[in-house]
Amino acid sequence: MNWDEQLVVAAVAALTPVADGDFRTVGAAIRGVDGAIYTGVNLFHFTGGPCAEMVALANAGGVQVVRIVAVGDQGRGVVSPCGRCRQVLLDLAPGVEVMLPGGTTAPVEELLPQGYHWSEGL
């Protein structure tokens, strides 16, 4: 697995102009199989607003995703995806490489062992 510094830079660039410390605190970047980078920023809300990873995934418009990273505001650097994002990635981007704090990466399946697969039904 490879560290993709361009993705980190893109996630920071997406977040920096809109980070407000309250509602927009995480940026994400995705690399598609086409090589393009798609970004997103979270929109926190008590009703469960979208995470940055989900916004970036939506912005990719169905392109197959190969790698993803999320970064926190206020210099927090790379952050791990939450459980909901891990589940969404497992279902919509199986095999995606997730960049993690400390310069490591892992396939999403390793971040959600014995996870439920939506495609298998209940």
Question: Whereabouts are the PLM-identified features?
Answer:
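Short beta-strand scaffold segments in enzyme catalytic cores
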Residues: T25-V33
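C-terminal binding/interaction regions
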Residues: M1-G21, I37, V41, V63-L122
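A general structural motif
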Residues: A19-V26, P50
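Short, charged low-complexity linear segments at domain edges
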Residues: C51-V69
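Compact, glycine-rich, soluble single-domain proteins
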Residues: V41-M54
